């Protein structure tokens, strides 16, 4: 179906993989707006910027630059990015009522759809995703949250994303098993397709301790494989490459959204400026991974990346 003119599936449906079809996602939206454009992001939240006309213009330019890359390389797009912090605890810290937070999340999705509409004839398929961030800080262990608490907590935002008719909810920068299981249970009950993107640290493991294979195996076991797929994000290839093995479980991993820099995450946060790394090298590393695992079909960027990085990634992951 078409929604707002952009080519999307709607009806909370995420399409199966199709040979030759690749998706390009957004880059590191928060770091780009903070350090490239100079906007303040309390609690690292983007959606409040929808109340700032200057920020709306810059965000429009930013998302168009991502979609221009998809159009240039003739790949599909899986686009989102304003609602990472649009969950109850973060909304309360930002001064939003539950009703106001839900409305802000709906406005975030509509903003993305309006931008996507401009590229409906240039990109072979545009899907819209809502981003579900962890309840706590992504760089903490977040070990205290239980599966049931996570299910209750994330149900709030997932209900809003279902109402927004997103093609996918992406639980992104998750770093422990119980919260991942809880958000998967919530999505399954509500009826929203869910991807889970896990973040690995410099030890090539989740910050809470398990390896990538241990986490995916455990989550799938507890959820009867209800997540549509898994991804890796907020990690540089030097961090996640040692965790990737040529075994059956890796087929559950459909994509990667790497950080631009090789620096350790906490050190990166303390820099106070944008660390863009080496976009050419990043693209080549992603290309190497794509050739080894051609089933991976979702590529994008995370902290420190923007359209230049996405261009290098897209150029390299398109396997002839």
Segments from the language model and where they lie:
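Domain-level signal for soluble alpha/beta catalytic cores
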Residues: 2-320
